[in-house]
Amino acid sequence: MKVAEVSQQYAALPWRRAQGFEILLITSRETRRWVIPKGWPMPGHSAAESAAQEAYEEAGVGGQMTAQAIGHYGYSKRLRGGTKKRFRVDVFGMEVTEVLDVWPEAHERTRQWLSPREATALVDDPELAALIRTFAGDQSGQALPAPTCSQAFWQKLKALLRLLGLR
């Protein structure tokens, strides 16, 4: 199996204070997994600007971005031909000040405001869940507890819920 070099992406972690501290997740287009808006670097734009553009296109939100990344996570994707591509995603916090009713990918995605605990339970990637947990704890002044069940248990439960069409 071939392993490709690591590709860079940028993401926004949209949040607001409404019914307490909330995180916005969206579904991916193909697998319908819960994720945060992310994409490729955009020529002529900073990393934070690229992340903000993805948040607008994928989630229909705008707001104030953190100047620096709040963290990063990695993931791998198997491409046709057997190559495994690796990605590093630098994540920027976005305090949401605008939520649009119409946005470019509205017909392709679902968006949902969630408590940090709900958000960390729904995302499949353990590194992203840990980043959300840490960021939410920093913003609320309270550390969120780590899940008490093993990651393998959560992965199996999520796969079962997807098979049953409940997620």
What do these predicted regions represent?
Residues I36, Y56, S115, W154-K156:
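Generic N-terminal leader/processing signal
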Residues M1-P37:
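N-terminal strand-loop-strand
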Residues P41-A130, L163-R167:
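Unchanged
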Residues P126-R167:
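Charged phosphate-binding loop/patch that engages nucleotide di/tri-phosphates or the phosphate backbone
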Residues Y10, W15, W34, Y73-Y75, ...:
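Aromatic side chains
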Residues T27, T66, I70, H107, ...:
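Residue-level detector of alpha-helical recognition elements and their boundaries
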Residues M1-E5, W15, S76-R80, P145, ...:
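Class I (Rossmann-like) S-adenosyl-L-methionine-dependent methyltransferase catalytic domain
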Residues K38, V123, A136:
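Short, flexible helix/strand-to-coil boundary loops that buttress conserved ligand/catalytic motifs
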